[in-house]
Amino acid sequence: EFGKKTIDTKLGARANMFCSPFFQLALDGKSEENQGEVLVGTLGWTGNFSFVFEVDNKNELRVISGINPYASEYSLKPNEIFRTPDFYFTYSFTGKGQASRNFHDWARKYQVKDGNQTRMTLLNNWEATYFDFDEAKLVKLMDDAVELGVDMFLLDDGWFANKYPRSGDHQGLGDWDETADKLPHGIGYLTEAAKKKGIKFGIWIEPEMVNPKSELYEKHKDWVIHLPNRDEYYFRNQLVLDLSNPKVQDYVFGVVDNLMTKYPDIAFFKWDCNSPITNIYSVYLKDKQSHLYIDYVRGLYNVLERVKAKYPDLPMMLCSGGGGRS
């Protein structure tokens, strides 16, 4: 049939919450696992994306993919280069199973750190304790991890903030010091306990986000993405920090760097991102507001490149409430 179909997102930070930057086209009838011609594509971009599929009057299909142009007009200086995201695709004559395996092989070889090596298994405390834990509970869970034979214990949300202790998701996000009441001996006590038990220690962070009830928000409200003439709209009681701002990039890098400097035995980071961008406005960008969606992603990439350069052997997972970003 003639016409156009668009798959896109405008959520900013947690861009993939409702759809993924991925498509699968069957070219000779409905695709099956082991037969049929299949084209599979995805986009190397962590922000807003758009896939447009259009069939013309000659029954020819055009696929246009890239950064979503929504609210993203971008002005360039003379001779400035704008690099568009990479488009990755594979073609299979033997069904969607082979196309999937092609992507897995490519990702392991070229994209994922140590992709062809075995992955660590872990025990995460989140659904065992949620925010209600102390040192004794965590050490007991480490014993369970040892008994299960997993490689690592991962401490999830709830370990930080003191003025507004992280007793729930309504406060503390942005204040990355251990909560003294929960962890009087600090993260170092836990990394040492894990080491003695023969397992590794990982930790949860969400450095791109902030609760309004936090010391960070009180000190740096200008770092927060929000419209000054609108009521703030919260997703999981939080807002998104403005990663187009180099000072915010330094702060976000510092969350990882400070923890690694103090506790070099941390072996893994679970980097969360639970909120889309709402009421979008950047104090930093001033009259270039249409740059924000793009410069946010570039700022994130800059931070991750800095982390990779300083800690090249440190594995990280960007989970975003599950598969909410790529």
Regions found by a protein language model. Give the residues of each.
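Aromatic- and glycine-enriched glycan-recognition loops and surfaces
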Residues: 125, 129-218, 224, 247-254, ...
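Active-site neighborhood of glycoside hydrolase catalytic domains
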Residues: 179-186, 192-196, 218-326
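N-terminal accessory beta-strand-rich subdomains and adjacent acidic, glycine-rich linkers
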Residues: 1-106
